[in-house]
Amino acid sequence: MALDVLVVGGGLMGASAAWRLSARGHRVTVLERFGPGHDRGSSHGTSRIFRLAYAEPSYTELALRALPLWRRLEEESGRAVLTPTGAVDHGPPEVLERLAEVLARAGRPGRRLSPGEVAERWPGLRADTAALYHPDAGRVHADDAVAALLDAAGRRGAKVRHGGRVTEIRRTGGGATVVTDADEALVADAVVVAVGGWAPGPAAGVVSGLPPLRVTQEQPVHFPVPDALEWPSFIHHPGAGLRLPGGVYGLGSVDGVKIGLHGAGPVVDPDDRDRTPDPAALDRLRTYAEEWLPGVAGTEPEPLTCLYTTTPDEDFVIDRQGAVTVLAGCSGHAFKFGPALGELAADLVEGGPGLPRFALGRTAPAR
């Protein structure tokens, strides 16, 4: 039976849910507070890492589920959204051993490389004590991906409304009512809340068990070098030669070689944040590049900002209570899974079970 579904939020998670719900024949309307392609949240920019390499097998399985969906999205939208680049993980050998084990079990084995082999293949990148190369990784074109998701949903009948903030969600009978700041009341069979760092507002009063969400302003940088698109994605895990908590990630993009610290930014209010670059954060990344990225020598980094919305255990929230499904807590690593998360949301809207790892009210310890 086709349902009337309101999706609150048109970033990665909301757009993914809209596409997969509309693909199943549901009548979908997306309510996006800001304008098309806005830079107020976590889904903007030119690049995100796609990778299969995770220490937790469930995430590798989820990435494998997302991969054919990204390709299907490209076919439906006519847009290229995922470019294969391969990826290099380097750092403590025990970390790489675990990644290699998970990849091998998934039938996607990586290749171990010495620092010298890394330097020979990618002269711009200096590896730590050991490295693991996995060819199935790539670069997701973030802005294009969100636009493609909404476009593909629209081709299947979904409507997208920009402007107007959702002020309240109420359960009504077997469905829900969404109230906007224009005093408009919209009634639906189901509501999907996918508003990133703003989730505690609309979700208040209609779901319980939402974990604390830590909203931070992150500050990656681009080094504008001409060969940026030839670089692999890379993750430098802390320990061994790196003492930055959370490690450093990087990848090539049309804007240059992008690097950033994982979850190292200050806590902010998503409605009231200063986007002025933090000189100390910029210096940390500049110092890192001087030691580990000889390929960007002589270029000045260009900073940008975005939001992380992080749960205590860095697992996502994807769960339903009644007619309301919540997608939140991307925790700085959700983009690669986008369409697969949309599938999980569609399952929940249709009454299917969720994954315990992503449940509301879970008691997983903080990492």
Question: What residues fall within each predicted segment?
Answer:
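Active-site substrate-recognition segment that forms the wall
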Residues: 19-23, 80-82, 197-322
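C-terminal catalytic lobe of FAD-dependent flavoproteins
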Residues: 291-367
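Beta1/beta-strand and adjacent pyrophosphate-binding region of the FAD-binding site
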Residues: 1-13
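Short hydrophobic core segments
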Residues: 8, 185-198, 342
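Glycine-rich FAD pyrophosphate-binding loop
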Residues: 23-42
